[in-house]
């Protein structure tokens, strides 16, 4: 009886028919994928993309040169140099991030006491040369200026969980 059952299954190719029916059932369902460059999926406010340095509304940069982000970076991708100003506060003279080393862990953003360094919503920052991935202070401030509205909205949305 067992041999007859096995022969009947082999003759009628039950597994093949079951697999084909599953394939055909998926063929008529709505697509689960999106057409990326033309359609965008929603992004979480916690998305960690391209780095940016933020400014206060009066235009002054937020970074107070505490160097916590440099100390906490596991990839050693951040380099900061600072000088005291006339009023006694410190400000950065050099703020570099080597994006080839960065692992996008977000520890720099968590360590910053004034929300100066953030990982913004930009995920499309490909470069043609390696040198373009070495971000200096001017590039980071320009990123912050470009994405400030969205960065502020993301930080506000994430505020209850911080």
UniProtKB/Swiss-Prot annotation:
It holds the Pfam family Fer4_7. It comes from Rhodospirillum centenum (strain ATCC 51521 / SW). It comes from the Bacteria. [4Fe-4S] cluster 1 binds at residues 63, 66, 69, 112. It catalyses: a quinone + NADH + 5 H(+)(in) = a quinol + NAD(+) + 4 H(+)(out). NDH-1 shuttles electrons from NADH, via FMN and iron-sulfur (Fe-S) centers, to quinones in the respiratory chain. The immediate electron acceptor for the enzyme in this species is believed to be ubiquinone. Couples the redox reaction to proton translocation (for every two electrons transferred, four hydrogen ions are translocated across the cytoplasmic membrane), and thus conserves the redox energy in a proton gradient. GO terms for molecular function: 4 iron, 4 sulfur cluster binding; iron ion binding; NADH:ubiquinone reductase (non-electrogenic) activity; quinone binding. Transmembrane segments: none annotated. InterPro entries: 4Fe4S_Fe-S-bd, 4Fe4S_Fe_S_CS, NADH_quinone_OxRdtase_chainI. The keyword Ribonucleoprotein does not apply. Its cofactor is [4Fe-4S] cluster. This is NADH-quinone oxidoreductase subunit I. Residues 53-83, 93-122 form the 4Fe-4S ferredoxin-type domain. NDH-1 is composed of 14 different subunits. Subunits NuoA, H, J, K, L, M, N constitute the membrane sector of the complex. It is a peripheral membrane protein. It is found in: Cell inner membrane. GO terms for biological process: aerobic respiration. The gene is nuoI.
């Amino acid at each position: 009886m067992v041999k007859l059952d096995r022969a009947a299954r082999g003759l009628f190719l039950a597994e093949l028919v079951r697999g084909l029916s599953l394939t055909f059932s998926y063929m008529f369902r709505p697509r689960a994928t999106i057409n990326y460059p033309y359609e965008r999926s929603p992004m979480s406010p916690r998305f960690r993309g391209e780095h940016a340095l933020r400014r206060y509304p009066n235009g002054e940069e937020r970074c107070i040169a505490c160097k916590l982000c440099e100390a906490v970076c596991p990839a050693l991708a951040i380099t900061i140099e600072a000088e005291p100003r006339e009023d006694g506060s410190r400000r950065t003279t050099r703020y570099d991030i080597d994006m080839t080393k960065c692992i996008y862990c977000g520890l720099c953003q968590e360590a910053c006491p004034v929300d100066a360094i953030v990982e913004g919503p930009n995920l499309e920052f490909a470069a043609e040369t390696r040198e373009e991935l070495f971000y200096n202070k001017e590039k980071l401030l320009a990123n912050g200026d470009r994405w400030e509205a969205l960065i502020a909205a993301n930080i506000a949305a994430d505020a209850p969980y911080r």
